């Protein structure tokens, strides 16, 4: 670069910084330019690995969507619990007015410290979300759900009135305002979304998410969560086998799929997930129905092996270390054993 051009660019940079403040523009090579992506664990180690950065990225918009009772809120509450374990503040905008505090507590959420809002309208919910993000003190904010963000005009109108595109416009405007401040505040904003069917679709998937297309564009990570099997103990249903597909990922390669168990009243089975991962990575040997780690026999059958690991946290920590090492992702926080 010639000296004149160098001087011209330096002058332009100084004018931009003078007018818009320090940090408005910077060279990518500078230390303070773009920090490494920090993440909050999801509560499922396999999903942390699939996301490529050890969890859901901070300072980004995340969308979790799927059919009813597929585990969307469970996953979001696990992320909130993990943020609290790391010393952060979690907030929950309960637009559906359906948050089960007892269940959240069972998943590890410190409910006494959880900030909860139950707004009357979609506008109120998104304004509260904006104020919380602007504070710069909230680490994770969950909005449950986009479908329940009903515009004020629809609430105040008659039951049969048509309000075409109102919610989509509301979401589009809110995300335009929110994206910049979310990035600056390093807050992870999670939108839970529902699925609807498009009428008359002949080819391709007829499924679509509510609230228009804006969220699809603004989200850095989109997770499609589905129940694929029922877990039983005898005749009693005790949980569900769940599959999560990373449909979109701006921070790592997308389209990875993982499976884990969600138990009723317990949430994601961290130890079951750990067992599956360790077998896949040849850290634990599976011969017939027997699971063994090194020279130690863990148990016969998956459930017995899971119970053995629950009683041996030092072995769990050792296996976790090996999984993190082979996956090449950083460990967040301390070595905590979770069922």
From Swiss-Prot:
InterPro entries listed in its UniProt record: AAA+_ATPase, DNA_recomb/repair_RecA, DNA_recomb/repair_RecA_CS, P-loop_NTPase, RecA-like_C, RecA-like_N, RecA_ATP-bd, RecA_C_sf
A Pfam family of the record is RecA
Q: Where in the cell is it found?
A: Cytoplasm
Give the highest taxon in the source lineage. Bacteria
GO biological process terms, semicolon-separated? DNA recombination; DNA repair; SOS response
Instruction: Give the UniProt keywords, A-Z.
Output: ATP-binding, Cytoplasm, DNA damage, DNA recombination, DNA repair, DNA-binding, Nucleotide-binding, SOS response
Keyword Membrane in the entry? The reply is no
What GO annotations for molecular function exist for this entry?
A: ATP binding; ATP hydrolysis activity; ATP-dependent DNA damage sensor activity; damaged DNA binding; single-stranded DNA binding
Q: What do the Gene Ontology cellular component annotations say?
A: cytosol
Per UniProt, where does ATP bind? 66-73
The similarity comment for this entry is:
Belongs to the RecA family.
What the entry lists under NCBIfam families is as follows:
tigrfam_recA
Tell me, in a sentence or two, what this protein's role is.
Answer: Can catalyze the hydrolysis of ATP in the presence of single-stranded DNA, the ATP-dependent uptake of single-stranded DNA by duplex DNA, and the ATP-dependent hybridization of homologous single-stranded DNAs. It interacts with LexA causing its activation and leading to its autocatalytic cleavage.
Question: What name does this protein carry?
Answer: Protein RecA
What species was this sequence derived from?
A: Geobacter metallireducens (strain ATCC 53774 / DSM 7210 / GS-15)
What's the encoding gene here?
A: recA
């Amino acid at each position: 670069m010639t000296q004149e051009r160098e001087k011209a660019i330096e002058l332009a940079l100084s004018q931009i910084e003078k007018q818009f403040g320090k940090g408005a523009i910077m060279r990518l090579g500078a230390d303070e330019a773009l920090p490494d992506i920090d993440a909050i664990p999801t509560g499922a180690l396999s999903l942390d690995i699939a996301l490529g950065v050890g969890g859901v990225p901070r300072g980004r918009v995340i969308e979790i969507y799927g059919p009813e009772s597929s585990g969307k809120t469970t996953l979001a509450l696990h992320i909130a619990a993990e943020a609290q374990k790391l010393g952060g503040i979690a907030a929950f905008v309960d637009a559906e007015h359906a948050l089960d505090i007892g269940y959240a507590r069972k998943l590890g959420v410190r409910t006494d410290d959880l900030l909860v809002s139950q707004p009357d309208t979609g506008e109120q919910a998104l304004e509260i979300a904006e104020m919380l993000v602007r504070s710069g003190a909230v680490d994770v904010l969950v909005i449950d759900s986009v479908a329940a963000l009903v515009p004020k005009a629809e609430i105040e109108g008659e039951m049969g009135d048509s309000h075409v595109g109102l919610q989509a416009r509301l979401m589009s405007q809110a995300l335009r305002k929110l994206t910049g401040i979310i990035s600056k505040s390093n807050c992870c904003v999670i939108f839970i979304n529902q699925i609807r069917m498009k009428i008359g679709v002949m080819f391709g998937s007829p499924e679509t998410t509510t609230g228009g297309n804006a969220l699809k564009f603004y989200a850095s990570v989109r997770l499609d969560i589905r129940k694929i099997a029922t877990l039983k103990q005898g005749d009693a249903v005790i949980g569900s086998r769940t599959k999560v597909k990373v449909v979109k990922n701006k921070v790592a390669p997308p389209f990875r799929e993982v499976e884990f168990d969600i138990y009723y009243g317990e949430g994601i089975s961290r130890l079951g997930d750990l067992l599956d991962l360790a077998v896949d990575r040849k850290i634990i040997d599976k011969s017939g129905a027997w699971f063994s780690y090194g020279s130690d026999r863990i148990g016969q059958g998956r459930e017995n092996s899971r119970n053995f690991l629950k009683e041996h946290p030092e072995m769990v920590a050792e296996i976790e270390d090996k999984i993190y090492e082979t996956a090449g992702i950083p460990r967040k926080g301390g070595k905590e054993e979770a069922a």
